[in-house]
Amino acid sequence: MIGLYLGLARGKKGWLFAAGVALGCNVLSRFSNLPEAAMIVGVWAYGIICWLEARKEIGKSLGQAGETTETAEKIKARKKAAGVKLRKKLLQDTGMCLAGYLTALLVLFGYIQICYGMDEYVKGILRLFSMTEVATDYTAASMIMGMFDWYFQNLYWEIRMCVFFVVGIVTVGVLELIGSYVRKDTVTKVLRILEWAGSIALAAVMVFWLYRQGFCAREYTNYGAIIWPGVTFLTLTLLVTLWRIFTPSAPKEEKLISGLIFLIVWITSLGSNNKLYPSMNNLFLALPYMYWQFYRFCKYVGSFRWKRITISAMPVKCLLGGFFLLFFVQVGLFGRNFAFAEGTGIQDIDAQVTNNETLKGVWMSEERAGWMQGISEYVNERGLAGRDVLIYGQIPALSYYLQMPAAFNPWPDLDSYQIAQLEEDMHKMQERMDADATYRPVILLEKKYAVYLEAGEDALEALQPTERERSLIVDNAKLLLIGEFMDAYGYEKTFENEKFVIFE
C-alpha cells in the first residue's frame, strides 16, 4: 500500500513496480491473498480523480476568459488532451504494477519448478478448491458471509451507540435554542459549560454502559476484549474513507490514501475463514489514519445552524473521543496480556520449559510446561531431534517444538487435508520405509487419540473427553488409517505422559 501511495502521489514509477512485486509475493505466500490484487483499483481510481480535477481546472481557467465559440473550442480541445493524458498515465502505471507482479510470480514459480515441479503446485491448488467438500467453512459463500456476519451482528451495538449520539445532539440543540432566546452573556456562558459538561458526561456514560453490557471483555486473555470494538472501528474506518473519497474539497492525495485504506480493510478478509481478524491485522494502517481524521474533525468541524435550530458537533466529538479512548485501552491491554494458545487465549502463564532450546524464554501454564518438559526430556535422551515424525491429534506445533520434521504434513488433522491425500502420502512413506530399512518415522499422538486406538471408545470415555474431542476421535477415518499403519509395521509405545504418547 505504501508503494502504491508513493508511486502514484509522487509520480515515482519504481514504487509502483515494488508494489506489484509485494502483491505478487503475497499470492505465493498464501494463495487466498489473490483478491489483494484488487489494490490495482487504486491506480485506476487515482487516475480518474486526477483527470476530473484537470477537467475542473480547465473549465475554471478558460471560463474566466468569457463564453465565446473560441473558448468553447479550447475547452473541448484541452479536455480531450487531458483524456489522452489520462489513458497514457493509466497504461504506464498499470504496466509498472503488472510488471512487478509478474516478475515476482515468475521468480517464485521458477523456484517452485526447480525444487518441486509446477505440477505439484497445480495439484496443491486443485486440492485447495476440492477441500470445500469436507471443510464447508472454506467455501466462497461461507467465507464472504462469515465476513459480513460480524458487520451485521455488530449493528446491535452500533445502533445503541447511535442513540447516545442522537441524545447528545438533541440535548445540545435544546440548550442552544434556549441560548438564542436568552441574550445575557452570563446565561450563555453557563449554557456553553453545560453543553461541554453534558457531552463529556454522556460519553462517560456510554463507555460505562458498553463495559457493563459486555461490548468488550475486561479479561484481556481472550478475543472478547477486542472483537466488537475492532469491528466497530473497522466500520467507522470504511465510512470515513468513503466520506473523504467523495468529498469534493478533499485533496487528491487524501482521496488516494483513503481509497487505499478502504481497499485494504475491505478485501483482506476475502479468502479467509477467520471472519474479520485479517482486516484487524491492518489496524496499524487504519488506526493512525482514523486518529488523524478525528483530530481534523475536532479542529475544523463546528456547528450547523438553520434559523434557530443548531446541530452541534460537540457531543459527536466527545462521544467519538470516548469510543476511541475505550478502543485504545482495549487493544493496548489486549496486546500486553494476550498469549495465543490453540486459537484462544490462556491465563496463568507462569512456568517455563528448561530442557528445550526452541521453547527457551517462552512462558506457559504450569500444566503445559510439565507436558513439554517430560516429552522434551525423552526426545533429548533418545536423540530423536531431526527424526521424521507423524503427528496426529491437533498438536501440529510439536514438530517445531521438538525439532522433528513432519514426515509429510505437519497438521494432517485439518479437514482441508483430505483422507485421499493422507493415503497417498502414507503410501509414499511406506514405499520409502520398505526400500530403506533405516528410515522409520516416529509416531506422536495426543493421548486421547492414542487411548482410543489402543483400547477403544470405553477407554476413551474414562478420560472424560469433551463432546468436540469425542466427535474428532471416534470413528475418525484418518486416525484409523494411521492405526492400521502402526499395526502393519509393528510400532510400540515407548513414551507416555498426561498429554502425549510416542510410538516407535
Model-flagged regions — what are they?
Residues 3-9, 23, 36-105, 110, ...:
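Perimembrane helix-loop-helix junctions
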Residues 332-416, 440-454, 498, 503:
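Short periplasmic/luminal acceptor-recognition loop of GT-C membrane glycosyltransferases, typified by
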Residues 93-176, 207-213:
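Membrane-lumen/periplasm interface segments of specific transmembrane helices
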Residues 233, 440-504:
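Aromatic/acidic, Gly/Pro-rich catalytic loop(s) in extracytoplasmic/lumenal soluble domains
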Residues 2-3, 15-33, 38-42, 103, ...:
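Membrane-interface alpha helices of multi-pass inner-membrane proteins
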Residues 2-18, 26, 50-57, 62, ...:
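Membrane-interface transmembrane helices that cradle and orient dolichyl/undecaprenyl
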Residues 102, 202, 247-264, 298-342:
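Signature aromatic-anchored transmembrane alpha helix within multi-pass, membrane-resident enzymes
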Residues 219-240, 271-311:
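Hydrophobic/aromatic-rich transmembrane helices and adjacent perimembrane loops
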